[in-house]
């Protein structure tokens, strides 16, 4: 298990929100994908995974409602 800082960004364009909502969390995970599966079990396959050059793992689902999860290993 590894410890991650998780930054979750949520934006609902349909509701006319001008600014994204962000939350922060730390968690011990075997894999970041497990966290996404727990939060979005039915929609997991809609998320795109990206590994950034700095090592961050990003899962994003962009649509009328956008979810972006950034995992940084601590």
Q: Residue ranges of each PLM-predicted region?
A:
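A general secondary-structure signal for short beta-strands and their flanking turns/coil
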Residues: 1-3, 17
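A short beta-strand micro-motif
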Residues: 3-12
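Short, surface-exposed beta-strand/loop "edge" segments at domain boundaries and coil↔beta transitions
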Residues: 12-19, 64-70
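A short, exposed loop/beta-hairpin motif centered on an aromatic-Gly-Thr core
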Residues: 15-30
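A short, charged, amphipathic alpha-helix used as a generic interaction element across diverse proteins
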Residues: 27-48
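Short, mixed-charge low-complexity intrinsically disordered segments
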Residues: 41-74
